[in-house]
């Protein structure tokens, strides 16, 4: 499975905007998922499903919860691509 960093980033932004109704003006690589972006446990669950459906990458709950920022989440997704 291959994907470029820009594809991961673009798709993640799309998920945040379309699936989670996040205002993308609040989203930067350093934005904290909970404090800055405003994700809660329901949003994390919806996000996990959307990431798997759109990117074909299954993140465990543990992997997702270790991501504090948008950039860390992008890196975790990209790492899954490298591992597969």
From Swiss-Prot:
Compartment list: Cytoplasm
Transmembrane segments: none
O-(pantetheine 4'-phosphoryl)serine, modified sites: 41
Induction, as annotated: Induced by iron starvation conditions. Transcriptionally repressed by IdeR and iron.
Domain Carrier span(s) in chain numbering: 6-81
Involved pathway(s): Siderophore biosynthesis; mycobactin biosynthesis
Gene3D superfamilies in the record: ACP-like
Cleaved signal peptide residues: none
Effect annotated for changing residue 41 to A: Lack of phosphopantetheinylation
Description of post-translational modifications: 4'-phosphopantetheine is transferred from CoA to a specific serine of apo-ACP by PptT, leading to the activated holo-ACP form.
One MF annotation (Gene Ontology) recorded for this entry: acyl binding
PROSITE patterns attached to this UniProt entry: CARRIER (PS50075)
GO cellular component: cytosol; membrane
Function, in words: Acyl carrier protein involved in the formation of acyl-S-ACP intermediates within the mycobactin biosynthesis process. The aliphatic chains carried by ACP are subsequently transferred on to the mycobactin core by MbtK.
Entry protein name: Acyl carrier protein MbtL
